[in-house]
């Protein structure tokens, strides 16, 4: 059930909103159980076989949290984190490591054809955040229903944002439709939903048509011309931004419809003037998780420059692996780790750089490394890189209009959250968004309905 599908927009969402409004008004004590039920129904629509996994994940981690609070045995939390990561590894990385093992002569590690449960990378990290903070004495005890909603809340369960317990739990005590600004918040939630849909459908999916065939050809071993390579590389640079930020806008808008404010995930990342600045603006909740729960745990910047660089490189390489079970993702993360390490050394040396130069270098670096992220093989990435430098011929037919329009919106415009929340309460604005929604629906009906890129992670 994609956020940009008719069954979600015209069946699940209206029923969910109506029942939520009725319960919030007449039986507020049922509100949280209802949201949990809706979240599991939403998750089960994708593949009901993984509902028991999500249920077990919630129940086991909650029971371990209760056991820790009763015994104060920190080893329980350590075991829980290891088990969570082990479950993630079995589903996501088993065949990846089996391929490595089979490189050893005489060893024949088995491989299994198992589907990846949607959202497992995200709800695993949610468990880790809560349990780690619980052990540190920062997180309080929560009941099973509240904890289940924190983990499985349907706008965030599939692809984030990664939400800290401290950002959402206190909101569950509110009666959102009784607030003085309830109507305004609901309206802005609808506008965010429409804005995210428009970004995904009009820009992200449009660019996918120019990007996917070229990367598929490269992965198949075909030569790529310079025009094709630049079109695919630039196109994917903006496709992934509008696809993922569009999803995030929709998730934030949907959550707002149910009275919950989720953290923002993007802050105009392609205006960054350094790689460090980029990771403060791109997938901000993941960057925050990697910093607080991995980089600092590895020593951070507290144990000297050498260990800081090792911790930074390791964090980014593992961050790349988190995105996918493939060496291309690891190398993508490692490349960003090396880039961030270079930035640390640059600043330690007391050097500076004009913002314009920093922006150009950062954009080029990010753009070139996206090739590794998008290509499914190193051979495919190499074909794209060869094409970028003209080894596959020049070519023709560069789709510059769509890419230029996407670049302008990505670099000049504000975030959808900032834009929507700055709009005055005017009837014509509501009408404009309603018209935009109708146009989006026609577009969805006419064209291919692409899944969100980050659903595969």
Please provide the spans of the model-predicted regions.
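Hydrophobic, aromatic-rich transmembrane alpha-helices
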Residues: 407-415
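Membrane-embedded transmembrane alpha-helical bundles that form the catalytic cores
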Residues: 1-406, 418-456
